[in-house]
Amino acid sequence: MKRIITIQDISCIGKCSLTVALPIISAMGVETAIVPTAVLSTHTNFSNFTFRDLTEDMPSIKDVWVKEGFKFDAIYTGYIGTLEQIDIVSDYFKTFNNPHGYIIVDPAMADNGKLYTGFDMAFAKKMTTLCSDADIILPNISEAAFITNTPY
Protein backbone atom coordinates (compact mmCIF):
# COMPACT_ATOMS: atom_id res chain seq x y z
CA MET A 1 0.00 0.00 0.00
CA LYS A 2 1.26 3.48 -0.86
CA ARG A 3 1.90 5.86 2.04
CA ILE A 4 1.86 9.68 1.95
CA ILE A 5 2.60 12.38 4.50
CA THR A 6 0.30 15.36 4.40
CA ILE A 7 1.43 18.44 6.31
CA GLN A 8 -1.29 21.05 6.84
CA ASP A 9 -3.72 22.55 9.31
CA ILE A 10 -6.99 21.31 10.72
CA SER A 11 -9.71 23.89 10.06
CA CYS A 12 -12.71 22.92 12.15
CA ILE A 13 -15.08 24.59 9.64
CA GLY A 14 -14.37 25.55 6.06
CA LYS A 15 -14.18 22.53 3.69
CA CYS A 16 -10.39 22.57 3.51
CA SER A 17 -7.21 21.29 5.12
CA LEU A 18 -6.81 17.91 6.77
CA THR A 19 -10.56 17.57 7.24
CA VAL A 20 -10.83 17.24 3.45
CA ALA A 21 -7.43 15.79 2.46
CA LEU A 22 -7.41 12.84 4.87
CA PRO A 23 -10.68 11.20 3.75
CA ILE A 24 -10.02 11.82 0.05
CA ILE A 25 -6.49 10.40 0.08
CA SER A 26 -7.59 7.46 2.24
CA ALA A 27 -10.51 6.73 -0.12
CA MET A 28 -7.94 6.41 -2.91
CA GLY A 29 -6.41 3.51 -0.99
CA VAL A 30 -3.35 5.45 0.18
CA GLU A 31 -2.27 5.28 3.82
CA THR A 32 -2.19 8.86 5.03
CA ALA A 33 0.17 10.03 7.76
CA ILE A 34 -0.70 13.51 9.01
CA VAL A 35 1.40 16.31 10.45
CA PRO A 36 -0.97 19.02 11.67
CA THR A 37 0.55 22.51 11.51
CA ALA A 38 -2.22 24.24 13.47
CA VAL A 39 -5.80 23.91 14.62
CA LEU A 40 -8.03 26.74 13.43
CA SER A 41 -11.67 27.29 14.42
CA THR A 42 -12.33 28.27 10.77
CA HIS A 43 -10.04 28.93 7.85
CA THR A 44 -8.45 32.38 7.64
CA ASN A 45 -10.94 33.79 5.14
CA PHE A 46 -13.49 34.10 7.95
CA SER A 47 -13.41 37.42 9.80
CA ASN A 48 -12.82 35.71 13.15
CA PHE A 49 -10.80 32.59 13.82
CA THR A 50 -8.67 30.99 16.49
CA PHE A 51 -5.21 29.64 15.70
CA ARG A 52 -3.45 27.02 17.84
CA ASP A 53 0.13 26.79 16.61
CA LEU A 54 1.53 23.23 16.55
CA THR A 55 5.06 24.14 15.44
CA GLU A 56 6.61 22.61 18.57
CA ASP A 57 5.05 19.21 17.84
CA MET A 58 6.20 18.89 14.24
CA PRO A 59 9.88 17.94 14.83
CA SER A 60 9.04 15.30 17.44
CA ILE A 61 6.55 13.62 15.09
CA LYS A 62 9.32 13.39 12.48
CA ASP A 63 11.80 12.05 15.03
CA VAL A 64 9.45 9.23 16.07
CA TRP A 65 8.85 8.28 12.44
CA VAL A 66 12.61 8.18 11.79
CA LYS A 67 13.13 5.90 14.83
CA GLU A 68 10.34 3.62 13.61
CA GLY A 69 11.89 3.47 10.13
CA PHE A 70 8.78 4.67 8.31
CA LYS A 71 9.10 5.23 4.57
CA PHE A 72 6.80 7.34 2.40
CA ASP A 73 5.93 7.49 -1.28
CA ALA A 74 5.05 11.17 -1.30
CA ILE A 75 4.85 14.31 0.80
CA TYR A 76 2.00 16.75 0.27
CA THR A 77 1.74 20.13 1.98
CA GLY A 78 -1.16 22.48 2.47
CA TYR A 79 -1.52 25.41 4.87
CA ILE A 80 1.73 26.09 6.69
CA GLY A 81 1.12 28.66 9.40
CA THR A 82 4.51 30.20 10.21
CA LEU A 83 7.95 30.95 8.80
CA GLU A 84 9.47 28.46 11.25
CA GLN A 85 7.15 25.73 9.96
CA ILE A 86 8.47 26.21 6.44
CA ASP A 87 11.95 25.29 7.72
CA ILE A 88 10.53 22.24 9.50
CA VAL A 89 8.67 21.14 6.37
CA SER A 90 11.90 21.50 4.39
CA ASP A 91 13.51 19.16 6.92
CA TYR A 92 10.68 16.64 6.36
CA PHE A 93 11.49 16.81 2.63
CA LYS A 94 15.17 16.07 3.30
CA THR A 95 14.39 13.27 5.75
CA PHE A 96 11.60 11.43 3.95
CA ASN A 97 12.07 12.22 0.25
CA ASN A 98 11.74 9.02 -1.74
CA PRO A 99 13.79 9.16 -4.96
CA HIS A 100 10.87 7.47 -6.75
CA GLY A 101 8.21 9.54 -4.99
CA TYR A 102 6.89 13.06 -5.18
CA ILE A 103 6.98 16.24 -3.17
CA ILE A 104 3.77 18.19 -3.73
CA VAL A 105 3.39 21.73 -2.38
CA ASP A 106 0.14 23.63 -2.24
CA PRO A 107 1.44 27.08 -1.25
CA ALA A 108 -1.80 27.92 0.57
CA MET A 109 -1.15 31.57 1.39
CA ALA A 110 -3.32 33.87 -0.76
CA ASP A 111 -6.64 34.47 -2.48
CA ASN A 112 -7.96 37.33 -4.60
CA GLY A 113 -4.49 38.86 -4.93
CA LYS A 114 -3.97 39.18 -1.16
CA LEU A 115 -1.97 37.15 1.33
CA TYR A 116 -3.94 35.42 4.06
CA THR A 117 -4.23 37.09 7.44
CA GLY A 118 -0.94 36.74 9.32
CA PHE A 119 1.26 36.35 6.24
CA ASP A 120 3.61 38.95 4.76
CA MET A 121 6.05 39.19 1.87
CA ALA A 122 8.78 37.46 3.92
CA PHE A 123 6.45 34.47 4.23
CA ALA A 124 5.68 34.53 0.49
CA LYS A 125 9.39 34.64 -0.32
CA LYS A 126 10.16 31.69 1.95
CA MET A 127 7.21 29.75 0.52
CA THR A 128 8.65 30.38 -2.95
CA THR A 129 11.88 28.72 -1.80
CA LEU A 130 9.92 25.73 -0.46
CA CYS A 131 8.11 25.45 -3.81
CA SER A 132 11.48 25.17 -5.54
CA ASP A 133 12.02 21.88 -3.68
CA ALA A 134 8.75 20.41 -4.99
CA ASP A 135 8.13 18.12 -7.93
CA ILE A 136 4.61 19.50 -8.25
CA ILE A 137 3.19 22.81 -7.01
CA LEU A 138 -0.53 23.55 -6.81
CA PRO A 139 -0.93 27.33 -6.53
CA ASN A 140 -4.11 29.22 -7.21
CA ILE A 141 -3.75 32.33 -9.40
CA SER A 142 -2.98 34.61 -6.43
CA GLU A 143 -0.32 32.26 -5.08
CA ALA A 144 1.18 31.87 -8.56
CA ALA A 145 1.47 35.67 -8.78
CA PHE A 146 3.32 35.85 -5.45
CA ILE A 147 5.59 32.89 -6.29
CA THR A 148 6.57 34.33 -9.66
CA ASN A 149 6.66 37.97 -8.49
CA THR A 150 4.07 38.81 -11.14
CA PRO A 151 1.36 41.44 -10.67
CA TYR A 152 -2.04 39.92 -9.88
Description of each model-found segment:
Residues 1-74:
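Small-residue (G/A/S/T)-rich helix-start motifs and N-terminal tracts that mark the onset
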Residues 77, 83-152:
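Conserved beta-alpha-beta core of the PfkB/ribokinase-like small-molecule kinase fold
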